[in-house]
Amino acid sequence: MVLILLCIKADLENVSSVSLPPGCQYCLTVKHSSAEDTREGVYVSSTETHELTGSRGTANFTLKWTKDSKHESYLNVQEVKNVTRPFTSEDHGKFVPIIGFECRGLEPVDWRPEDGFIVKAPSGTVWEDVDLSEKEWVDYDEKSGESVSIMELEWEFRVHKEKK
C-alpha cells in the first residue's frame, strides 16, 4: 500500500497555526492507480469505516471502478506520527504534510479545501470552522488589535517514503 501525504503551503499574517480537527472530511478527486478513470467530489473521513469485500479489514472509503469489478479500491485517512502536523508561521514558503492517505487501487490527485479549519493567533485567539474554499481568509483579532489572514493557500500530494 502507498501512503500519500496532503501537504499545504500558505502566507500567514498574525496567525500562529492552521490545522484541521481529527475526524474532519476531506473532499478529494481520486484517480484509478492503473487507468485514467477519476472520481471528483469524493468525501473521506477517518470517522467512517466500511468493511472490505472478502477481507477482515476495513477502510474509510471504498470504490469499485466498474459495477462488475471483482477488485475494490480503498483509502484510509491517517495521521502519521512525527510527520503530519499543523501548518505554522515558521513554515513560510514550505509545504507541510497535514494528513496521510493510505491507498490501494486509487490515489488522490486533487483536494478541495472547505470549512472546518482551526486557526490560532499569537494572542491566543482561536477561530474554529474557518472556510478556506476560496484559498484565503481574513479576519480581525480583537485581543491584539490586528488583522489576521491566510493567503495564497496551495497544496500538493507527496508519496511518503519512511526513513529507515
Regions from the language model: what does each represent?
Residues 13-27, 31-110:
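Structured domain cores in non-transmembrane regions
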Residues 1-15:
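C2/C2-like lipid-binding beta-sandwich modules
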Residues 99-164:
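Glycine-rich, aromatic-bearing surface loops/beta-hairpins
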